[in-house]
């Protein structure tokens, strides 16, 4: 007999159940959706973010509100008759191991599996980004899987990579910024590559033209432009992608020259990167909107 909720999904850090897994020392399950997080450190980070989001969006207009947390036991997420672990993230631990469960208000489905796309609902997401920026917050991981379709509106979920706007460009984070990810703006790659090149000798660093060319070549070699190849025709139709030496190419060159080709003070450089950080989520949401609507034959031209 399954003593846990229905498994809705499983990621790198844990699993999501509906209804939530029964909390330890409680007879009834709580309402909502339960997220069981494998590592306590990750759970505490998510709880901290959840509390902040609840303060800025208590009614859940743009996010899925965190309602409560509790402790659960591994034995409560097994199927007794088959002794099969429902949540693979917990499969190596014993039945008495405790986990943190974070309970969210809404169930819904994410956009990657949603049966229909409502363009008007993206306006609500844009308002959500405005709210985040007003509260110095960057989501940093906007994609279809992290947008929840509630029927009447879309909301953002999974803020595990979120941070303050002035922390988006961080030396500690430079490695994951190199990820060849279509939702990440080109600035992420440039910043990470700049950090790598800081290890070089001063004579090379003082040669601005050579440094700019090297960084740009690395961005090009990373296949960033090629990520858009399969969408080239659609992008060209909406004026986003003119050609290989078009808008994207020139935009990257501009950013490299702005950050390296001028002698900015540390204070001004910090302001510049915060300004770029404010565009990161907007870029990601724009890519989601394009991918979800460009080839959707059910949408009218006006809706697109």
Regions found by a protein language model. Give the residues of each.
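Conserved hydrophobic alpha-helix
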Residues: 125-132
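Catalytic-loop of the protein kinase fold
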Residues: 133-150
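Conserved N-terminal boundary motif of the eukaryotic protein kinase catalytic domain
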Residues: 1-7
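C-lobe/activation-segment region of protein kinase-like
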Residues: 155, 159-297
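Conserved C-terminal C-lobe helix
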Residues: 303-304
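ATP-binding glycine-rich loop module of kinase domains
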Residues: 10-83
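Conserved structural core of kinase catalytic domains
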Residues: 61-118
């Amino acid at each position: 007999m399954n003593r846990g909720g229905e498994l809705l999904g499983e990621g790198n850090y844990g699993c999501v159940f509906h209804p939530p897994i029964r909390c330890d020392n409680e007879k009834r399950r709580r309402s909502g959706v339960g997220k069981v997080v494998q590592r306590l450190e990750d759970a505490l980070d998510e709880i901290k973010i959840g509390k902040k989001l609840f303060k800025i969006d208590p009614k859940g207009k743009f996010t899925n509100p965190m309602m409560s947390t509790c402790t659960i036991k591994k034995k409560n997420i097994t199927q007794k008759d088959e002794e099969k672990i429902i949540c693979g993230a917990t499969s190596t631990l014993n039945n008495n191991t405790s986990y943190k469960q974070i309970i969210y208000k809404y169930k819904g489905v994410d956009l990657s599996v949603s049966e229909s796309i409502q363009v008007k609902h993206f306006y609500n997401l844009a308002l959500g980004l405005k709210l985040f920026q007003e509260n110095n917050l960057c989501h940093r991981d906007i994609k279809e899987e992290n947008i929840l379709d509630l029927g009447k509106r879309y909301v953002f979920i999974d803020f595990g990579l979120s941070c303050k706007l002035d922390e988006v460009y961080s030396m500690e984070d430079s490695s994951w910024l190199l990820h060849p990810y279509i939702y990440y703006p080109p600035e992420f790659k440039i910043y990470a590559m700049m950090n790598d090149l800081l290890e070089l000798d001063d004579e090379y660093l003082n040669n601005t033209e050579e440094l700019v060319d090297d960084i740009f070549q690395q961005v090009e070699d990373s296949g960033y432009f090629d990520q858009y190849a399969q969408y080239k025709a659609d992008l060209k139709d909406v004026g986003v992608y003119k050609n290989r030496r078009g808008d994207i190419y020139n935009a990257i060159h501009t950013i490299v020259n702005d950050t390296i080709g001028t002698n900015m003070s540390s204070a001004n450089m910090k302001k510049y990167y915060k300004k770029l950080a404010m565009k990161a989520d907007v870029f990601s949401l724009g890519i989601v909107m394009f991918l979800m609507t460009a080839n959707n034959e059910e949408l009218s031209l006006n809706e697109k």
